[in-house]
Design a protein with these regions (language model features):
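C-terminal motif of bacterial Sec signal peptides marking the signal peptidase cleavage site
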Residues: 32-36
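Pocket-lining segment of extracytoplasmic ligand-binding domains
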Residues: 204-206, 211-304
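Short helix-capping segments at alpha-helix termini
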Residues: 91-95, 189-193, 233, 300, ...
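Short, glycine-/small- and polar/acidic-enriched structural segments
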Residues: 44-202, 206-212, 216, 220, ...
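Bacterial N-terminal signal peptides that target proteins for export
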Residues: 3-25
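Secondary-structure end/capping motifs
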Residues: 263-351
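Conserved C-terminal helix/tail region of periplasmic/extracytoplasmic solute-binding proteins
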Residues: 337-382
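Bacterial signal peptide processing site
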Residues: 38-40
Length: 382
């Protein structure tokens, strides 16, 4: 899962030294965490190294050395996280002679992009929108895959709201900011943005059905809060930006460009292993349970396996319902990048000097193209 924090940072910059110092400290803490609290490649498998790859390509991947995967948010069972955990546990990385270490991210995309650019992480989950913002701010990373132009950000309302313009003049809750895709959806639907009262809420979605402090709508993630509310017996309407042709992304991945240039086969095969694991984890309820169990083992006793199973099944359904046009699973849609730039310009999140042509060069399908044949991931590797 990719938590889009960079938009908030862009819209609410500050030069106060105390905040800058705290931000630097937070980045340092995550960087320190990258030296420990991780799991090495193929921890739970008996597969033999190189069993799914030629000797020549195996040597190339071994020469790449240690590869650090940094998740978007802890070991949550989201697309872009669970399949990497499963690829490790099922031995797929080992099968391809890859030395992959998994690291849990904090949920702060801005930190992930900096760690990726500095080489402290090799590959990481970074939403397409966040990658554009990072590159616009001089952070050098490259987008290498995405599962869908749909996104995770949604707006929830109680059942008495049947059309979004009914929210005019009402209270809308958020977790620090209203995601650009949600605002774009609301404005496209005819909501008078300046009429809204925007309030920061915590992470308890029950404030919506309780209409706490007059709350009529609440932002969230399609795979999280709606499932929590449903489990509690609360029925809400979920408004998804993709239904209004608003751009976003799910499961997007980025790489350190210097590593990718030096070790292209390793980048290809990291994606190959992850996509092979994605297919495994999505194949049946039993295999989904198996994969979520791997994440639970890494996370500890407090891991909510039931909720995380719902997270995976919800996100993979959104991906299946909204395949990337003219692309295999993992392929990036250049037109979606153009639409994202337009949206970021609309809300002054990136400078007008950042063009769609600029942004398209920050993404590549070369690695996905290299591992795909007739729309399917090639396994084993050549």
């Amino acid at each position: 899962m990719q938590h889009s924090t960079m938009q908030h940072r862009t819209m609410h910059r500050t030069t106060h030294r105390t905040k800058a110092a705290l931000a630097a400290l937070a980045t340092a803490v995550v960087a320190l965490a990258l030296t420990g609290c991780s799991t090495g490649s193929s921890a739970g498998t008996t597969s033999s190294e190189g069993s799914a790859i030629s000797a020549e390509r195996c040597k190339e991947n071994q020469d790449a050395g240690k590869i650090t995967y940094l998740s978007g948010y802890q070991y949550q069972s989201s697309a872009s996280i669970l399949e990497y955990i499963a690829a490790d546990e099922l031995g797929y990385f080992k099968d391809l002679c890859l030395d992959v270490t998994l690291k849990p991210g904090s949920g702060d995309t801005a930190q992930n992009t900096k760690l990726l650019a500095s080489g402290q992480a090799t590959v990481s989950a970074v939403a397409e929108q966040d990658l554009i913002q990072a590159r616009a701010n001089g952070i050098d990373i490259t987008g290498i895959s995405s599962y869908s132009n749909a996104g995770l950000d949604v707006l929830m309302t109680n059942k008495d709201i049947t059309k979004l313009p009914q929210l005019d003049g009402q209270v809308v809750g958020h977790k620090g900011y209203v995601p650009a895709s949600v605002r774009a959806m609301m404005e496209k639907a005819g909501v008078e943005w300046d009429s809204l009262t925007l309030v920061k809420e915590g992470y308890d979605p029950s404030v919506l059905p309780r209409k706490q402090n007059g709350l009529e709508a609440l932002t969230g993630f399609v795979s999280n809060e709606p499932n929590l509310l449903k489990a509690a017996g609360d029925d809400v309407t979920v408004w998804q930006p993709v239904d209004y042709d608003i751009p976003s992304s799910i499961g997007a991945m980025a790489v350190n460009p210097a590593f990718a240039k030096a070790h292209p086969t390793a980048v290809e095969d990291v994606l190959r292993a992850a996509l092979h694991a994605y297919d495994f984890c999505s194949a049946s309820e039993a295999k989904t349970k198996q994969c979520v169990g791997y994440a639970a083992k890494l996370s500890g006793a407090t891991y909510d396996t039931a909720q995380n199973t719902k997270i995976w099944t919800t996100e993979t359904k959104v991906i299946a319902d909204n395949p990337t046009p003219d692309q295999p699973l993992g392929g990036i849609d250049p037109e979606n990048v153009t639409k994202l730039v337009d949206m970021l310009h609309q809300f002054d999140i990136v400078k007008s000097s950042v063009t769609a042509d600029d942004a398209k060069r920050w993404f590549t399908n070369e690695y996905i193209d290299a591992i795909t044949k007739d729309g399917e991931t090639v396994w084993p590797a050549p």
